[in-house]
């Protein structure tokens, strides 16, 4: 059984848990305290509000332990605000959080809640059929380092990338019924670790 953690401080936790429950041989685990990081094979940092999540990571004393585990190879996937937390740089903001993927992100790049949208797109690394991508006040990646692989662009903007054990997406696969992106994280990042 593969134990996949979902950071349970704020955001789309339940939605990620429900998708993970649909996948055979996967046990979703809520992660709220640093002790919850023991015995998981990967972790998802969900969408939410990045500033709030960053503060809660410190308040719950989980930031430093989680950062160390990611730096030591724990597979991690950040969706939307989770991507912001993992980025090396955040445009217009001096401080960043985990700094574990060599990207710069622009927060709320697609505008307000009213500018949220959904689109079906191909992601060749994942499947030959289109996947629904849901963007809600989404960030996008403005620059990538030399070791970062761009997985997807939408409207010329980078919305998915990976580097070593880190996967990031601007969009919310957990807000669809589709398990393919979660399976991709498990198959390519956790099983191939």
From Swiss-Prot:
Q: Which InterPro entries match?
A: Class_I_gatase-like (IPR029062), PdxT/SNO (IPR002161), PdxT/SNO_CS (IPR021196)
Q: Which Pfam families does the entry mention?
A: SNO
Protein task: Catalyzes the hydrolysis of glutamine to glutamate and ammonia as part of the biosynthesis of pyridoxal 5'-phosphate. The resulting ammonia molecule is channeled to the active site of PdxS.
List the catalytic residues. 80, 172, 174
Q: Which residues make up the binding site for L-glutamine?
A: 48-50, 107, 136-137
What name is this protein filed under? Pyridoxal 5'-phosphate synthase subunit PdxT
What family, per the record? Answer: Belongs to the glutaminase PdxT/SNO family.
A GO MF term: glutaminase activity
The alphabetized UniProt keywords are: Glutamine amidotransferase, Hydrolase, Lyase, Pyridoxal phosphate
């Amino acid at each position: 059984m593969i134990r996949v953690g979902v950071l349970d401080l704020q955001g789309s936790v339940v939605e990620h848990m429900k998708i993970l429950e649909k996948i055979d041989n996967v046990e979703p685990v809520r992660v709220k305290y640093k002790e919850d990081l023991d015995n998981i094979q990967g972790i998802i940092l969900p969408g939410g509000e990045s500033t709030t999540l960053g503060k809660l990571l410190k308040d719950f004393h989980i930031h430093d332990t989680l950062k160390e585990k990611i730096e030591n190879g724990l597979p991690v996937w950040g969706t939307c605000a989770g991507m912001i937390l993992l980025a090396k740089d955040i445009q217009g903001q001096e401080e960043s959080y985990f700094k574990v993927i060599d990207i710069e992100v622009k927060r709320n790049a697609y505008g307000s809640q009213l500018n949220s949208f959904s689109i079906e797109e191909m992601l060749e690394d994942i499947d030959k059929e289109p996947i629904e991508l849901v963007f809600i006040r989404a960030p996008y990646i403005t620059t990538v380092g030399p070791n970062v692989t761009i997985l997807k662009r939408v409207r010329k903007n980078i919305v998915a990338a990976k580097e070593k054990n880190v996967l990031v997406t601007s969009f919310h696969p957990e807000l669809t019924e589709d398990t393919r992106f979660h399976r991709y994280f498990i198959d390519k990042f956790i099983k191939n670790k």
